[in-house]
Amino acid sequence: GLENLVMGGGPCACNPEPIADFFDLFFLGEGEEVDLEVLDLLGIAKRKGWSREEFLQKAAQIEGVYVPSLYDITYHEDGTIAAITPKNGAPATIKKRIMPDFDQADFPENFVVPFIDVVHDRAVTEVLRGCIRGCRFCQAGYIYRPYRERSVDVINRQAYDLCHNCGYDEVSLSSLSTSDHSHLADLMEKMLVWAEPEHVDLSLPSLRIDSMTCLLYTSPSPRDTR
């Protein structure tokens, strides 16, 4: 049946093979679209009474979905892979999913907030994805390529809506390297227009000293930009 499907994804699944035997499918790449497509397919499968195998064969046709059971892998004597053979119409190459237009990536702006103190008790908006630095030790800088920025207007609107809808008094501009956003100074100016009178803090994690601008020193939020 279709109960207890085990699905994986995210950075920990960028190399799924060591745990492939324990999963029905993996999402490769970014999940804003592919997870919804798989869930829609699962709804159809349940309504039509598909078997588990039928569902997985259909899911494998969705770009960014890897179904380990649909591939036979043979190895050389030294343990390296000799051949990967797809079965039952599974694609020979699985292409990871990305959001080419980052402004169109789905982002929650109105959700239930916890009624307890939590560690990251603030609104978070993702200002860019990927990184221009290419540090060799950084997994995230490679798996989130290509580098994409959200536009100033979209970030500003998301941050404003999050604070007004959810009651937060702090918003974090999240990314791998926020200070590398090409329009950060313009973004800060626009956000301070509403953040300052409403006493909303602006938090900028992942700053690099070589790309910070004078604006970040001279235009703090009401309780000091961090």
Predicted regions located by residue number:
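Glycine- and acidic
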Residues: 21-23, 120-125, 136-146, 168-176
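Single conserved hydrophobic/aromatic residue that forms the stacking wall/gate
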Residues: 217-226
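Structural preference for beta-strand elements that scaffold enzyme active sites
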Residues: 5, 170-172, 199-203
